[in-house]
Amino acid sequence: MALGWRVSGTNRSEQKVIEARSIGISSMIFDQGTPLKEPEKVFSDVTHIIASIPPSEIGEIALLLHSDELRDAASLTWVNYLSTPAVYGDRSGGVASEFDEPTPTSKRGERRLAAERAWIDTFSDTRVSVQIMRIAGIYGPGRSVIEQVAAGRARIIEKEGQVFNRIHVDDIG
């Protein structure tokens, strides 16, 4: 926004919409299963999309509801789908990289891999570049160990030699 970009987004709650608008982000409600109002208008001047909505049991909801409008968005050039390393499955302590074939072993991983493929397939015959970012170990405000302990969500992970990546929430967007 400081560089002149206009940023828009969706949220599931009215409170989050209000918070986004308070910092200059145009925001609207998009709840799983409810299509956006006037999607053609919403997507008419969109150039970039960062998609972070977790897929549901029935699939990638944004595409199930709006793939036609997104494909018809003449100004759209780039999509980044935020996925998870869960698509690599259980590597028994081994390291996974983007060159490894995804072999999910959980429902979450299977759904995310299906969503990745849905985004890629939706734009496969267009000029839109689709990128997949598999992020893990998110930390930042609302995600610290102290906050997890206070909320009763803290976990102890004891695995000899385990390594993992960390990324600050501000560095994702």
Residue ranges and their predicted role:
Residues 1-5:
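N-terminal Rossmann NAD(P)H-binding glycine-rich loop of SDR-like oxidoreductase domains
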Residues 8-14, 31-33:
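N-terminal Rossmann-fold cofactor-binding loop
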Residues 22-35, 51-55:
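Rossmann-fold cofactor-recognition segment
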Residues 39-81:
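NAD(P)-cofactor binding segment of oxidoreductase domains
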Residues 49, 172-173:
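Non-catalytic, hydrophobic alpha-helical segments
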Residues 67-107:
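Conserved Rossmann-fold NAD(P)-dependent oxidoreductase catalytic core, especially the SDR/UDP-sugar
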Residues 92-132, 157:
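Catalytic helix-loop patch of NAD(P)-dependent Rossmann-fold dehydrogenases
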Residues 120-164, 169:
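NAD(P)-dependent short-chain dehydrogenase/reductase
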